């Protein structure tokens, strides 16, 4: 996960593309769940959760700020960190990337692969069915 940002046209909107490594995701999850947090709060929480030392967490925070995923405000002598991207937006981007990279953009291939290996609970089957019906109805109204 090298640092890179590019402008991307997505359904008519220009969005900043932010690629996150697995470690950066862990730190972002902590911020999405509890924001804002001080540098000390984050380094202590990540040490307890992952065993990372202080400099590892601070390096990840710096990289996340460079990528535009995290904002930092100075409050007195403390730095306070906030997520600058919504979890939903980051997850949607990662999902589109996976779909394009692994399944050539085919959602049906992804669903097929995921359901071949293990049985889906009836609740999830019902949710997928409802989503497909909703998409079909929207298609006929457009």
What is each stretch, according to the model?
Residues 1-4:
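Short, small-residue-biased leader/transition segments that mark boundaries at the very start
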Residues 6-30, 104:
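Short alpha-helical segments that sit at the start of domains
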Residues 6-14, 116-142:
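C-terminal regulatory/oligomerization modules of transcriptional regulators
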Residues 17-23, 75-93:
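Short, cationic-aromatic polyanion-contact patches
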Residues 37-45:
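Short acidic, hydrophobic short linear motifs in intrinsically disordered regions
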Residues 44-53:
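Short helix-coil junctions and helix-kink-helix linkers
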Residues 68:
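Glycine-centered, phosphate/nucleic-acid-interacting loop/turn motifs that mediate DNA/RNA or nucleotide
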Residues 85-111:
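Conserved segment of winged-helix/HTH DNA-binding domains
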């Amino acid at each position: 996960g090298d640092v890179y940002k590019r402008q991307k046209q997505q359904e008519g909107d220009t969005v900043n593309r932010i690629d996150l490594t697995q470690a950066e995701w862990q730190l972002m999850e902590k911020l999405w769940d509890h924001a804002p947090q001080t540098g000390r709060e984050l380094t202590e929480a990540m040490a307890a959760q992952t065993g990372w030392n202080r400099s590892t967490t601070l390096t990840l925070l710096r990289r996340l700020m460079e990528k535009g995923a995290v904002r930092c405000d100075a409050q007195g002598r403390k730095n306070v960190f906030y997520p600058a991207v919504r979890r939903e937006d980051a997850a949607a981007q990662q999902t589109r990337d996976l779909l394009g990279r692994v399944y050539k953009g085919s959602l049906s291939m992804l669903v097929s692969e995921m359901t071949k290996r293990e049985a889906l609970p009836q609740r999830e089957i019902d949710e997928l069915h409802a989503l497909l019906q909703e998409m079909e109805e929207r298609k006929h109204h457009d």
